[in-house]
């Protein structure tokens, strides 16, 4: 069994608060760091500090370093090579006073959290495509948009009252077969990386520490039919995404819709009264829904030697798992942890073919 280069290197992390690096004595009392990145959700961070009183006063829990609202940047890596993994603001302090002393956690989320995630008043966007709306929302939140273009141009799109802007654009992402995520100072609204080259290759008993997976046809379908209404022409719009028309994740594999048809015959999902403006848009929605259903086919968790280059939206090639489970997987969620046991990365992954 070969050994990954990083396994015996000490993991490193850096934390900057309000653009100033934490002093060495502050880093020395941080006993754990955890960062979670999620598709269609905000990214979160948490680090844990051990404190002790000096002359009756705690040094760190009372420090302005950890005040609510402070900007935080966390970098992870090895041997001086580190990567910025999250940038956000302190949103919570969680102290625990016990007989063993004081330990407190500092928690927060991405920049733009308040504007994007908080339920807000209704807002109307006029004469814009979905991609234009996301670009506008990103700039409102002080983020840089990284957006794939969409069609058509809508006369009006309304974000309902009581819904967050992030939930609103996540709905548009689903409609277009896109995904939305926060990546540093960027708001990403894009097609998943289908048929992409793997960003990283990871091997069982080398980088891979554990792998758990399930194959499930409970939510897969063979076909999707979308029915809408053209109010101008006064006619029904119908589109059909047939077996095998989901987006390809890996060539040479059998897609979930094909396996579903072989096992159960026609399993057709019909979506009625969808707000589609044309047959072309209805076809995109049908294919997006077929792809979404197939994405539930194989789901897994892979724990690896800590790797900050694993991100949401990455394509991982997992090796050494046998012919059935080796292959390309798409990353939906990543949790990086540094603690007494070292640096590990846990990725939730999916695959739509076997």
Regions found by a protein language model. Give the residues of each.
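Short acidic/polar beta-strand-loop edge motifs in secreted extracellular
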Residues: 60, 114-136, 146-171, 175, ...
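Assembly/oligomerization scaffold segments
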Residues: 1-113
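Sec/Tat-exported extracytoplasmic proteins
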Residues: 141, 176-180, 230
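Extracytoplasmic/secreted envelope proteins and their assembly/folding machinery
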Residues: 87, 131-134, 166-169, 223, ...
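An acidic/polar, Gly/Ser/Thr-rich interaction patch typically located in mid-to-C-terminal regions
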Residues: 35-65, 209-354
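Short, compositionally biased
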Residues: 87-96, 193-196, 329-340
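Short beta-strand-centered interaction patches in the first periplasmic/extracellular domains
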Residues: 1-3, 94, 103-106, 110-112, ...
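Intrinsically disordered, low-complexity terminal/linker regions enriched in Pro/Ser/Gly
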Residues: 133-149, 260-267, 274
